[in-house]
């Protein structure tokens, strides 16, 4: 059994989890920045009262800093959408949060048979090209073919996709969402190596954007998973290549959600009518602006028509909020289903799950884990009802008086 001792790596992990700098933590605790740096690098051991100050500032249980990290995962690459406007701390914080999601996934996989990753093998030549100048038509045709291949592989036809989150999870891609507290990050995907193989996670910034944009974000990240390399750090690629990959992922999302074979035919009826796009939005669950761009991409409308429609969108104030838009939250995800199953089958209680997580070093407050996994509020903090330990005696004589 590992003894309890302060571990600097755990302090750094908790600090970055909260998106806090050394200076910020120093200000919140009254401990010097130099001392905190020494703590994180295990070059000095803090007094217990300082651990308590750190615990309160970072909102982590004191026990967290005295534990060994028993659940090891290896994160390969994280693709962030809107990377250019996100700070390094934004990206690091969200990446660490998703690492904890991966650890919890691995713990639960000891009890739950999660779907295996189910993706076709595709050849995407442009992703391996040394040239960043891409012929749009050729690129679009290639990605159109890949999205069609995936739809056929998953047997979802060429019509509107219903519950995209369910389809992703059914095919082994884990979806979660939490508040990034920043508009700089729309969504991100992460490749993690676990004991039971490779797993891809997608996280979206929910509760701010409408359903159409969330679905586009999910499809965008799916594009990264399917067509882009995951064996290199994004810090090593230049801005031009990153922009190209973002463009390719956007194009994949567009072709995947709005296939040429079906949407392309339907939109031709009234391709310059905003009222018609408003109707199509209810069916395809994609934003009006994305559908207009797709029509232009398919040469159904001219550049002049595209520009005119977008000016009309701006004039109506639809750039930021289209008709029918309201903040969208993910449906109950695979983690919610897994935890409900364990509790309903009396495999483990809510309190038992928290003990299990602590056993593997995931010592957090229930609310943090609920937020990480997009769970119903309170599912991990409900108390197990105690079984009565006393009861009335059964009297032999029915009429015996007290």
Residue spans for each PLM region:
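Active-site hotspot residues in diverse enzymes, especially metal/ion-binding acidic/histidine motifs
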Residues: 1-402
């Amino acid at each position: 059994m590992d003894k309890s001792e302060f571990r600097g790596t755990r302090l750094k992990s908790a600090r970055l989890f909260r998106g806090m700098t050394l200076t910020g933590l120093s200000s919140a605790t009254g401990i010097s920045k130099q001392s905190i740096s020494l703590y994180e690098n295990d070059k000095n051991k803090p007094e217990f009262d300082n651990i308590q100050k750190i615990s309160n500032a970072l909102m982590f249980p004191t026990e967290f800093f005295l534990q060994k990290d028993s659940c090891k995962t290896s994160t390969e690459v994280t693709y962030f959408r809107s990377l250019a406007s996100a700070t390094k701390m934004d990206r690091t914080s969200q990446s660490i949060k998703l690492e904890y999601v991966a650890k919890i996934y691995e713990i639960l996989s000891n009890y739950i048979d999660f779907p295996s990753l189910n993706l076709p093998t595709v050849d995407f030549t442009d992703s391996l090209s040394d040239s960043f100048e891409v012929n749009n038509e050729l690129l679009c045709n290639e990605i159109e073919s890949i999205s069609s291949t995936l739809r056929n592989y998953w047997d979802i036809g060429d019509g509107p996709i219903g519950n995209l989150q369910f389809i992703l999870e059914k095919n082994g891609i884990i979806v979660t969402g939490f508040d990034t507290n920043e508009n700089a990050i729309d969504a991100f995907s992460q490749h993690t190596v676990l004991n039971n193989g490779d797993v891809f996670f997608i996280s979206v910034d929910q509760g701010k954007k409408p359903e159409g944009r969330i679905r586009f974000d999910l499809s965008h990240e799916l594009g990264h998973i399917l067509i882009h390399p995951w064996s290199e750090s994004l810090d090593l690629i230049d801005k031009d290549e990153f922009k190209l990959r973002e463009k390719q992922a956007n194009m994949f999302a567009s072709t995947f959600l709005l296939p040429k074979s079906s949407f392309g035919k339907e939109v031709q009826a009234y391709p310059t009518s905003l009222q018609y796009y408003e109707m199509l939005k209810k069916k395809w669950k994609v934003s009006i602006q994305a559908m207009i761009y797709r029509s232009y991409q398919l040469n159904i409308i001219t550049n002049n028509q595209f520009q005119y429609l977008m000016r009309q969108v701006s004039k109506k104030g639809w750039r930021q909020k289209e008709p029918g838009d309201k903040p969208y939250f993910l449906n109950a995800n695979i983690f919610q289903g897994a935890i409900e199953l364990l509790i309903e089958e009396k495999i483990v209680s809510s309190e038992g799950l928290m003990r299990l997580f602590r056993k593997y070093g995931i010592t957090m407050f229930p609310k943090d884990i609920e937020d990480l996994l997009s769970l119903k509020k309170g599912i991990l903090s409900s108390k197990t009802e105690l079984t009565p330990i006393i009861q009335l005696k059964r009297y032999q004589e029915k009429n015996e008086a007290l």
